[in-house]
A protein has these predicted regions:
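Extreme N-terminal starter segment of soluble prokaryotic enzymes
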Residues: 1-2
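PIN/NYN-family metal-dependent endoribonuclease catalytic core
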Residues: 5, 15-50
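A secondary-structure boundary/capping signal
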Residues: 6-7, 36-37, 105-106, 122
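Alpha-helix capping/helix-boundary segments
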Residues: 9-10, 40, 92, 108-109, ...
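Residues at secondary-structure transition points
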Residues: 18, 35, 57, 61, ...
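Conserved beta-strand segments of alpha/beta enzyme cores
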Residues: 33, 71-72, 119
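Active-site neighborhoods of divalent-metal-dependent phosphate/nucleic-acid chemistry enzymes
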Residues: 68-102, 107
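Acidic, PIN/NYN-like endoribonuclease modules and their adjacent C-terminal/linker elements
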Residues: 82-83, 107-132
Length: 132
């Protein structure tokens, strides 16, 4: 199963020991193939530094964990503008085009429900896939 995690899921994985942290642990354990979108990585690093003011050592540590969990890194070549309400989300949709799931807490993405064959779901819904 190929999965793209949005920035908000990655940030939450490091700030709380909840569902998003469990999802990242599952990626590290190779329970699914985590596809990292380069713009998501860039936004993740920016938010860690600017909003949460983590120092470079902490940012490097977090980056190493995400890298360890990553199965593939994708750089969207042509993010389509106007696909969703937030124009910046076009890049993640292009990255997720061949994934089975895009896991996010972003309502601008969730409202779409699907992008091609990719199901767009909340972290809680994704975690439930592992409860059987």
């Amino acid at each position: 199963m190929k999965v793209v995690l949005d920035t908000n899921v990655l940030i939450s994985a490091f700030l709380t020991d909840g569902i998003c942290a469990r999802i990242l642990r599952r990626a590290r354990n190779r329970e699914f193939a985590f596809i990292l979108c380069r713009p998501v990585l860039q936004e993740f690093l920016r938010i860690l530094r600017e909003k949460f003011q983590f120092d470079e050592g902490e940012v490097s540590f977090f980056t190493a964990i995400v890298s360890e969990a990553t199965w593939e890194i994708r750089q969207p070549e042509n993010p389509f503008p106007g696909i969703c309400r937030d124009a910046d989300d076009g890049a993640i949709l292009v990255c997720a085009a061949e994934a089975d799931f895009l896991v996010t807490g972003d309502d601008d993405l969730l409202i779409l429900e699907f992008y091609g064959k990719t199901k767009i779901i909340r972290p809680r819904e994704f975690e439930l896939l592992f409860s059987n």
